[in-house]
């Protein structure tokens, strides 16, 4: 039976447990070898329920998508441990199977049971995006993959450590299946260090407060999140609202793929029904069921940002994913481009939610992470792989214009500075600037997209791979706001500049020394009718170079021309 816990102790324990996860984040960010973790912070840590795997606490610095999806990863380990029948203190499981743990194969998950007085108390988990985990394409974003095996090597949940003893044969297998073993070993050591720190901090916490009190706090925090979510829903009108948006293509067949949602509120519950979404496709924009459910959680957290980050928030939310759709693709369907699909899921949820709560949602953000990988060999023969994400504009809201040049709504990750990338790889950023006329018009316009131009300084058989979206279907506005500009990718060859046939996806374009690639990323959609934007704001945007005079007059009329800036 759980102990009673007073509100002050509950608040203190909540803060202490969040701090544990935050410290685990911080130690990995400092220890990781690859900039995707060290600079972009594509990683996460948390505490998870001993029997259900539900998220209890997650660090604030990790990616939001991991809040929901890591509970599925822990559940996969719980199932595997039950199958083995001998879970012990000091065991650590490792795996990257996206159909069990969500997201994609680049995300390596470590799960460690935490025991207190010989009894399982909870799980600690670490996930980080490794630089390369094999597969056909360096960096693992393969737009032409038709199964998981073409994306990366697939590791099911296996024990990396048994009762505290690292199994070197498992490490040997993992390191043999990456192009960058030094980077992978550094990331693995960082994740192991984060788990060690988590165990140490949990020992300190339970030594101070006792296991019964901390357990009661964890239960109470989930119950509180449930109650807060229900209270928020009761403030909204009952009803049903629908939205549909599209992916450009699946990288194999150049046909649009619809993602549809019906959002229904009844009292203190919400249903998100994705009936009408495209069936499983040949290419890698499928996602596994855990990823789809976790994405719904991320969207809900954006709409209700003050709610706690634990599984209790999702108790009043019913997520209905059609069997056979690209949102519930079974193994071995390719899921490497999951980021593009979940961003479209968030867009349609926001668009539908605008009918129920227009003051709580934002217009569509730029809607693609633009995963660009450039790889080659240095003059000394050593291989190099530069992999990074490239930002764009966020949507306008009832309160303000959208954020200029931010990262994706699934992410709190940062975009690595060009100086870091130029120091690490033989490239030069010839341009990194805000993109004029990229934002959707509105009472509050969207944020600005960006322009990146990257030159290869050492040829060595360099190749570029792009996995993006929004090349054919622009980010939309809400509440009568307008759409933003499209995503545009181009690459340089001897006869000039070219665009890929699939618009937003490209595989293995050869680049000689001195040749460049260029990304013009979308802005965010506008919020509210452009006619409601004050002329002074339009004039300021023209003066700042955010919008051309011609576009300003087209979108907002001539009144801004009478304003002196």
Task: Please provide the spans of the model-predicted regions.
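Glycine/proline-enriched, intrinsically flexible loops and inter-domain linkers
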Residues: 1-91, 97-116, 120-565
């Amino acid at each position: 039976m759980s102990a009673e816990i007073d509100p002050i102790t509950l608040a203190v324990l909540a803060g202490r447990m969040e701090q544990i996860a935050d410290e685990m984040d911080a130690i990995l960010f400092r220890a990781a070898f690859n900039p995707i973790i060290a600079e972009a912070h594509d990683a996460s840590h948390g505490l998870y329920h001993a029997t259900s795997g539900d998220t209890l606490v997650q660090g604030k610095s990790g990616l939001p998508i991991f809040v929901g999806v890591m509970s599925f990863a822990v559940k996969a380990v719980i199932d595997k441990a039950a199958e083995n029948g001998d879970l012990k203190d000091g065991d650590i499981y490792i795996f990257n199977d996206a159909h069990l743990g969500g997201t994609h194969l680049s995300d390596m998950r470590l799960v460690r049971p935490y025991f207190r007085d010989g009894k399982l108390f909870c799980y600690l988990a670490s996930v980080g995006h490794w630089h390369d985990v094999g597969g056909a394409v360096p960096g693992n974003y393969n737009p032409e993959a038709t199964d998981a095996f073409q994306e990366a090597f697939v590791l099911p949940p296996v024990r990396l450590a048994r009762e505290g003893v690292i199994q070197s044969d498992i490490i040997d297998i993992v390191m043999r299946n990456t192009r960058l073993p030094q980077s992978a070993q550094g990331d693995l050591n960082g994740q192991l260090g984060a788990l060690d720190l988590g165990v140490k901090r949990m020992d300190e916490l339970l030594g101070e407060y006792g296991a019964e009190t901390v357990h009661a706090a964890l239960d109470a925090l989930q119950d509180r999140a449930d109650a807060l979510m229900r209270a928020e829903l009761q403030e909204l009108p009952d009803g049903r609202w629908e939205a549909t948006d599209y992916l450009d293509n699946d990288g194999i067949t150049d046909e649009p793929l619809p993602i549809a949602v019906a959002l229904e509120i009844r009292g203190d519950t919400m249903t998100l029904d994705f009936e009408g979404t495209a069936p499983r496709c040949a290419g890698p924009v499928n996602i596994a069921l855990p990823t789809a459910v976790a994405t719904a959680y991320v969207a809900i957290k954006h709409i209700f940002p003050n709610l706690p980050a634990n599984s209790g928030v999702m108790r009043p939310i019913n997520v209905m994913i059609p069997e056979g759709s690209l949102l519930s693709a079974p193994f071995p369907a390719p899921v490497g481009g999951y980021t593009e699909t979940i961003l479209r899921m968030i867009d349609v949820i926001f668009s539908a939610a605008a009918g129920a709560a227009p003051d709580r949602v934002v217009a569509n953000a730029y809607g693609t992470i633009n995963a660009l990988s450039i790889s080659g060999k240095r003059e000394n023969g050593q291989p190099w792989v530069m992999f990074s994400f490239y930002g764009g504009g966020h949507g306008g809201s009832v309160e303000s214009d959208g954020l200029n040049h931010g990262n994706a709504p699934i992410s709190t990750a940062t975009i690595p500075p060009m100086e870091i990338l130029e120091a690490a790889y033989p490239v030069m950023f010839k341009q990194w600037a805000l993109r004029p006329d990229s934002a959707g018009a509105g009472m509050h316009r969207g944020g600005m997209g960006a322009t990146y131009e990257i030159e290869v300084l050492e040829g060595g058989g360099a190749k570029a791979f792009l996995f993006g979206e929004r090349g054919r279907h622009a980010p939309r506005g809400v509440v009568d706001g307008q759409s933003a500009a499209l995503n545009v990718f181009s690459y340089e060859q001897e006869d000039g500049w070219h665009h890929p046939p699939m618009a937003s996806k490209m595989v293995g374009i050869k680049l000689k020394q001195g040749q460049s690639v260029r990304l013009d990323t979308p802005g965010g959609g506008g919020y509210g009718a452009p006619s409601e934007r004050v002329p002074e704001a339009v004039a300021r945007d023209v003066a700042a170079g955010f919008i051309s005079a011609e576009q300003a007059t087209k979108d907002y009329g001539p009144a801004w021309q009478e304003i002196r800036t």
